[in-house]
From Swiss-Prot:
It is an enzyme of class 3 (hydrolase). It comes from the Bacteria. Pathway: Glycolipid biosynthesis; lipid IV(A) biosynthesis; lipid IV(A) from (3R)-3-hydroxytetradecanoyl-[acyl-carrier-protein] and UDP-N-acetyl-alpha-D-glucosamine: step 4/6. It comes from Klebsiella pneumoniae (strain 342). GO terms for molecular function: manganese ion binding; UDP-2,3-diacylglucosamine hydrolase activity. This is UDP-2,3-diacylglucosamine hydrolase. Belongs to the LpxH family. Mn(2+) 2 binds at D41, N79, H114, H195.
Length: 240
């Protein structure tokens, strides 16, 4: 019995090794799980479910095969792929979840999320996030021709990279009080998230008791997952 969590694969055609590693993961470890949760940034960018990128169809088919094998797959949007919609969800067999979800895993209450909303010290990012999550702005963007959406997405990624290069490492990490606040709001002692690309298990205090925050790593030269069993919560890195 095990439930698996992954995040921050940032799949793109320019990184075929990561795609190959993910496909092997779906054909192997994922098939043995009780469920698979993808906590955002599965893709480096997402400009709409109507994008005919062959990579998207390949990934949808691979995830659907896992679902068809009896392993439910769930998805929480990240800051790169927040426009993933119901069309792709149907193609892949995944169920789209809310930004914050509380799970009962073998008697252990666990909160899961992408993690970007915990970075409350980065006010510029939060302002940008609020803007691009505005429903009418999303509808307007998705109504644009694909070639224009690609240009906008490329410019946004370039601007984000430039902005992050001038930010301190601390400002791009989670705010400790934001972590405690969200755990106490959901009455949990465990939090699993991604986004920061700083894999670790942090011990803290929440709800007047010991608590743990497990941070998933990004997939670069190796894979990263959290494996929850009735007896343990493990942060695991593995070769592609």
């Amino acid at each position: 019995m095990a439930t698996l969590f992954i995040a921050d694969l940032h799949l793109q055609t320019e990184e075929p090794a990561i795609t190959a590693g993910f496909l092997r993961f779906l054909q192997g470890e994922a098939r043995q799980a009780d469920a698979l949760y993808i906590l955002g940034d599965l893709f480096e960018a997402w400009i709409g479910d109507d994008d005919p990128n062959p990579l998207h169809q390949q990934i949808a088919s691979a995830i659907k095969a896992v679902v068809d094998a009896g392993v439910p797959c769930y998805f929480i949007h990240g800051n790169r792929d927040f426009l993933v919609g119901q069309r792709f969800a149907r193609q892949s067999g995944m169920l789209l979840l809310a930004e914050e979800e509380r799970l009962d895993l073998y008697g252990r209450e666990v909160l899961i999320m992408h993690g970007d909303t915990l970075c409350t010290d980065d006010q510029n990012y939060l302002a940008f996030r609020a803007k691009v999550h505005t429903p009418w702005i999303q509808r307007l963007f998705l109504a644009l021709p694909l070639f224009i959406r690609r240009r906008i997405a490329a410019r946004m990624r370039a601007d984000s990279k430039a902005a992050n290069s001038s930010k301190s490492m601390d400002i791009m990490d989670v705010n400790p009080q934001a972590v405690v606040d969200v755990m106490e709001r959901h009455h949990v002692q465990w939090l699993i998230h991604g986004h920061t690309h700083r894999p670790a298990v942090h011990e803290l205090q929440a709800n007047g008791q010991p608590a743990w925050r497990v941070v998933l790593g990004a997939w670069h030269s190796e894979g990263s997952m959290v494996k929850v069993t009735p007896d343990d919560v493990e942060l695991i890195h593995f070769p592609f």
